[in-house]
Amino acid sequence: MDIGIFIPIGNNGWLISSNAPQYMPTFELNKQIVQKAEGYGFDFALSMIKLRGFGGKTQFWEHNLESFTLMAGLAAVTSRIQLFATVATLTIPPAIAARMASTIDSISNGRFGINLVTGWQKPEYEQMGLWPGDEFFHTRYEYLAEYAQVLRDLWATGSSDFKGEHFSMQDCRVSPRPQADMKLICAGQSEAGMAFSAQYADYNFCFGKGVNTPTAFAPTAQKLLEANEKTGRNVTSCVLFMIIADDTDEAARARWEHIKDGADEEAIAWLSEKGSADKSAGSNLRQMADPTSAVNINMGTLVGSWATVARMLDEVASVPGTQGVMLTFDDFVKGVEDFGEKIQPLMTSRKHIAQLKEVV
């Protein structure tokens, strides 16, 4: 099973809590995290894009780096790990995104790919005059399909004459083309999102569900397999989990409860309010805004000792259609170290990493 890391491009990572580590995003922090991840055999690193935060006393996600430029910098200081940047498709034309990706492909020597997002948080785009109107909530995957087709055309042939409702290319050219097959990611869980991923993406990211319920996402993975049957493609699932691990189950649980006790209720309320504006929202957004565990936007959470977390991650690997997991931590630097030293060696699904190290 592949292991990736969802790097903290925004302040405080993925914890909306005053009891979690409070920090600003910097290149140096993310370089340290990704270089450590590469050293421990992580397969990929992905950065999101966020253009406006949730406010509250923790100013959650009010401070963010930009995804493509961050990953370009990380490409220059890594050598093996795959890197994915996120493009907010309302902000960057596909031909420009294609050229930016080709540039980072050159920097990374073929280790780059793109995560495509349509945008669900209206204030991010409204502040720049880029919000196309609330009807976009209903047409965004048609828009994204055209965007992806232009990217595929330009990377495959170096030119595009695509004509659609949203984009019109006239002998549009991009050269040099990427040296490696450029992978696309989407994070759809709605019916429309799944259909898009099955048609255009190489991987589909989905949320894990609940606390210590590692296989609860299985119905989502199954829906993607069913969508694949309609397109004849083999698009696999990568699942998002937060790891809260310690020497004992009790110590890990105490840390998780302490984080929840410091929840920034104002920021969480803002997330719920803005998320409700999207009446067509798929389960991803509904899950993020659910009050049950909104302190970490309701991503799946694995809490326990090193052995307990290793066992649960192996359970994730057993779900049909699962390519890998993407991990977040309360403390990213220590979390990556603890994963590499104390969790990964106990995982059956990562035995190949130990074997590779023995060969080296």
Swiss-Prot record:
It catalyses: uracil + FMNH2 + NADH + O2 = (Z)-3-ureidoacrylate + FMN + NAD(+) + H2O + H(+); thymine + FMNH2 + NADH + O2 = (Z)-2-methylureidoacrylate + FMN + NAD(+) + H2O + H(+). FMN binds at I49, K50, N115, E124, R140, Y141, S190. InterPro entries: Luciferase-like_dom, Luciferase-like_sf, Pyrimidine_monooxygenase_RutA, SsuD_RutA_monooxygenase. The FMN-N(5)-oxide reacts spontaneously with NADH to produce FMN. Requires the flavin reductase RutF to regenerate FMN in vivo. The keyword NADP applies. GO terms for biological process: alkanesulfonate catabolic process; nitrogen utilization; uracil catabolic process. It holds the Pfam family Bac_luciferase. Belongs to the NtaA/SnaA/DszA monooxygenase family. RutA subfamily. GO terms for molecular function: alkanesulfonate monooxygenase activity; uracil oxygenase activity. It comes from Pseudomonas syringae pv. syringae (strain B728a). Its EC number is 1.14.99.46. This is Pyrimidine monooxygenase RutA. The keyword Oxidoreductase applies. Keywords: Flavoprotein, FMN, Monooxygenase, NADP, Oxidoreductase.
